[in-house]
Design a protein with these regions (language model features):
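Glycine-rich Rossmann-fold phosphate-binding loop(s) that bind the pyrophosphate
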Residues: 11-12
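A structural signal for isolated positions on well-ordered beta-strands in alpha/beta enzyme cores
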Residues: 7, 30, 68, 117, ...
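Gly/Ala-rich phosphate-binding loop of Rossmann-like dinucleotide-binding domains
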Residues: 19, 23-24
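N-terminal Rossmann-fold NAD(P) dinucleotide-binding loop
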Residues: 15-16
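Rossmann-like NAD(P)(H) cofactor-binding subdomain of soluble oxidoreductases
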Residues: 87-149
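Conserved N-terminal Rossmann-fold NAD(P) cofactor-binding segment
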Residues: 2-5, 28, 34-78, 82-95, ...
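Extended hydrophobic secondary-structure segments
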Residues: 31-41, 117-126
Length: 149
């Protein structure tokens, strides 16, 4: 399993620690974030968030080549979506906004191949995996041979 390449999309409070720990455990991990400053900081072996012990781990895994950060997703076997799902008030109800998830999914559509796995780590409402499948289908991706978690 450790021969699988993982692409973590979203390098915030969930994505960066997840990417770092996976890298520390022997996986090759590409981290993707739209913020160029975040990518630069991580590639220097530093962190942009506060998390006890994370700085040392990120420094170690970047130096070893197990973790690198990019502004665009890279080819992988497993894509882990770790982007925000902010709430927006609509008709006096707070509704989760799936636009960041949609953008993340669209950013990997041309990289997906048979057997790949998409893991949604973002806090999201019931039906979000169906939303992901429907989005991919609308983008012309055959989802029959993809795995979702």
């Amino acid at each position: 399993m450790k021969d699988k390449i993982i692409n973590v999309i979203g390098l915030g409070y969930i994505g960066l620690p997840t990417a770092a720990i996976l890298s520390q455990n022997g996986y090759r991990v590409y981290g993707t974030d739209i913020n160029k400053d975040v990518v630069s900081i991580i590639n220097e072996g530093k962190i942009h968030i506060t998390e006890p012990g994370l700085q040392d781990i990120v420094h170690e895994v970047v130096k070893s080549g197990k973790l690198s950060a990019h502004n665009e997703p890279k080819l992988a076997n497993i894509y882990m979506i770790c982007v925000p799902t902010p709430l927006k008030e609509i008709n006096n109800k707070f509704e989760p906004q799936l636009s960041f998830i949609e953008s993340a999914i669209k950013s990997i559509k041309n990289l997906l191949k048979t057997g790949d796995m998409i893991i949604l780590e973002s806090t999201s409402p019931v039906g979000t995996t169906r939303f992901i499948c429907d989005t991919l289908k609308k983008e012309g991706v055959d989802t029959a041979n993809l795995n979702f978690a």
